């Protein structure tokens, strides 16, 4: 994938998510976002239901628009597994729970700090393996810089949910196979 094609994809996005102003991105603007990503996030904390706090790194409007534009681009890389109920249209917490109706036992596990546990290195490897020779290592680095904060996937970025599902796809396949082997059901819900 050439840099020009990537920039054209972002430059042509003029939809307005969540009432934001239409935005087109020049190569200079994208470069600025990649070279100084720390300037484009606003950190804050939210209380967790279970106690403690969840650290959010919300992208500033321009970077948020870039990430919002990239999300469908990343979505083309995979088809979510049937067992994945996080951040998929029409597949929420209720549909996730329905998978387990009638079961005698239920095991609920939480992956602590799931978003920031996904590193920039992991994402780069994933991009290179999924796109193969279409994506140069340089372009993979560019994508990673646009969607990570301090080398990690941030909570609060519009591209993070689809990327967590992409990273977890192999895990889903393995855990679903293991569950099936033992006569159990597996699903993954992310909120």
Predicted regions mapped to residue ranges:
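Non-catalytic, polymerase-adjacent accessory regions of viral genome-replication enzymes
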Residues: 1-43
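A broad structural signal for alpha-helix termini and local helix breaks/kinks
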Residues: 11, 74, 78, 131-132, ...
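Alpha-helix initiation and N-capping motif
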Residues: 24-28, 63, 67, 80, ...
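Reverse-transcriptase-like RNA-dependent polymerase core
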Residues: 30-49, 136-146
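Short amphipathic beta-strand starts and helix->beta connectors
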Residues: 39-42, 91-93, 178-182
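Short, conserved non-catalytic motifs in the polymerase core
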Residues: 44-67, 85-89, 108, 145-165
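Active-site-proximal segment of RNA-dependent polymerases
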Residues: 63-108, 112-116
């Amino acid at each position: 994938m050439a840099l020009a094609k990537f920039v054209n994809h972002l430059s042509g996005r003029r939809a307005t998510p969540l009432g934001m102003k239409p935005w087109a991105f020049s190569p200079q603007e994208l470069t600025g976002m990649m070279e100084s990503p720390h300037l484009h996030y606003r950190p804050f904390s939210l209380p967790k239901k279970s106690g403690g706090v969840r650290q959010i790194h919300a992208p500033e409007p321009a970077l948020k628009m870039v990430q919002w534009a990239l999300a469908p681009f990343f979505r083309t890389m995979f088809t979510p597994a049937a067992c994945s109920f996080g951040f998929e249209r029409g597949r929420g917490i209720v549909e996730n729970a329905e998978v387990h109706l009638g079961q005698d036992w239920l095991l609920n596990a939480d992956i602590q700090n799931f978003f920031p546990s996904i590193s920039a290195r992991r994402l780069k490897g994933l991009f290179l393996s999924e796109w193969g020779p279409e994506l140069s290592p340089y372009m993979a680095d560019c994508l990673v810089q646009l969607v990570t904060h301090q080398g990690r996937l941030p909570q609060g970025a519009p591209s993070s949910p689809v990327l967590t599902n992409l990273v977890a796809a192999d895990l889903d396949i393995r855990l679903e196979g293991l569950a099936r082997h033992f006569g159990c059901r597996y699903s993954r819900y992310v909120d």
